[in-house]
Amino acid sequence: KGHALEGKTTFIDAAIGAELDPYTTVKFRPGQGNISTHTIGSVCSYPLMRVEEMYLIEAEAAAHTDGAKGAALLNTFMKTYRDANYNCTLSNSDEVVQEVVLQKRIELWGEGRSFFDIKRLNMSVTRAYEGTNVPQPVRYNTNGRPAWMNFVLPKFEGVYNTPVYNYNNPDPSGRYRPVK
């Protein structure tokens, strides 16, 4: 009780809302707003792609070649659709790309899109920090793109498909130790 998100998920019934753990969110509205009946509530629209994502992809692409143009596109999107007071004053390409990625993570939170940014941009992942809610056994920090994001083919795929036998991503098991 008393956490910042308490009572903010107004489209679910109060009895179920009271049972949710702190900081549990329901990003997409359940079918007919009914979270109690799984045959109704599970039927909901889950966007595979959103127009907001396209604006942010355009801003990032522009920032890779021209930081000022990327910042201008980001400002246009943010001021038009999110926060009229937002102002990105960066012009360095790398800094603008990082700002766009931050805004993508905020906009597309919970949709699994940061996975692709982390891989493509060779970003580090930091899960061990003061105040983290990541459970200790999986609290990993990386230096660069995490190996756990590489898909490893199952062993028997190579047995029955010999051309891929010697071509596989390295198995990341045991590569990382949790940070205490």
Task: Give the location of each predicted region.
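Acidic/polar-rich alpha-helix caps and helix-coil junctions
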Residues: 1-180
